[in-house]
Amino acid sequence: MECVLDVLVIGAGPTGLACAIEAMRSNLDVLVVEKGCLVNSIFSYPPGMTFFTTRERLEIGDIPFTTINVKPTRAEALEYYRGVARFYHVPVRYHERVVGIAGSDGNFEVRAAATDGDPKCYRTRKVIIATGYYDIPNLMGVPGEDLPKVSHYYGEAHAFYQRKVAVIGGANSAAIAALDLFRHSAEVTLIHREPELSRHIKYWVRPDIENRIKEGSIRACMATAVREITRDAVWVETAQGEPTRIENDYVFALTGYHPDFEFLRRVGVEIDPGTSRPNCNAKTRESNVPGVYLAGVVISGRHTNEIFIENGRFHGNQIIADIQKHPGARAPRPKETAGPPPLE
């Protein structure tokens, strides 16, 4: 008999790990498939980043998050989630991108591709998609956005010392990046299409960015739309319709991110055309495709400020409880083949 998993989780972020741990606690055979490294999105955050939330709200698997900081750093979070994965021996296939899901409830075939192009295939009864949203930036769709000097992810400020840097956006990421660049002696211009900064900026960040703008340390172009990015400038249009050239060396377009809607559509998940929210049962987290569940921020569509680690980490409880309700929740397996199916 061919080995069949009970549950395959796509994504080894905190939510995906929490789902896998809940499945393991319920004695289900589970495998996690991850396109990058463990908690890949957190790994991609700026090295000096501090979480906005407290450590207990990041905990999964009933493992305490011990740290000297009330609000953990990126490094502390990486260490914590490594420890959780190690404690539970969570089975993860790293650097494999899921490219398709075929079959039906109880008999899915999940196809993946390793970074070296080697194809993989897994059979599973249920699928949990916990792919997050950080991989796909909201593009502006302007000429020059694909230039090497443009990035949709902020890292460290040191390389931009005494350089002219434009930060596009008006939410937390843009505000924090602008402040960090300013404090490393970059010449910063903040460009935002709205007349005011986002109301979602954290209360301890807002006065800092507003005061730097007020004193002129950071130039702010509000109610301003980016029209083109060139090798040495950013062309914008003000609210009055005036084209303006801003001298520029580098651009951080921190305009937000969104889930992989195209992948969800290929799987068969319905996407609301207005909100981009996927069709998902709020109680069970099962999508309109029977046997395919959604967990974490992927549920929120473009409203990615609604679901975070602190609430997405509980989705696994709902999902596994629903899977366990159905007769034959555990897949039949030959005694000599414990654990996940072999790689193909």
Where are each of the predicted segments found?
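Short, glycine/charged-enriched secondary-structure capping and boundary segments
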Residues: A23, Y45-M49, N107, G141-E145, ...
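A Rossmann-like FAD-binding core segment of flavoenzymes
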Residues: F87-A114, C121-T124, R183-T275, A331-L343
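Beta1-alpha1 glycine-rich phosphate/pyrophosphate-binding loop at the start
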Residues: E2, A12-V90, A175-W204, D272-G274
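Rossmann-like dinucleotide/flavin-binding elements
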Residues: M1-L5, V9-K35, Y153-S198, K283-A331
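Alpha-helical elements of Rossmann-like donor-binding domains used by nucleotide-donor carbohydrate transfer enzymes
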Residues: Y80, D208, H315-Q318
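Short glycine-/acidic-enriched loop or helix-start segments at secondary-structure transitions
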Residues: C19, I42, G103, N138-M140, ...
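FAD-binding core/adjacent interface of flavoenzyme oxidoreductases
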Residues: M1-I10, R25, N40, S44, ...
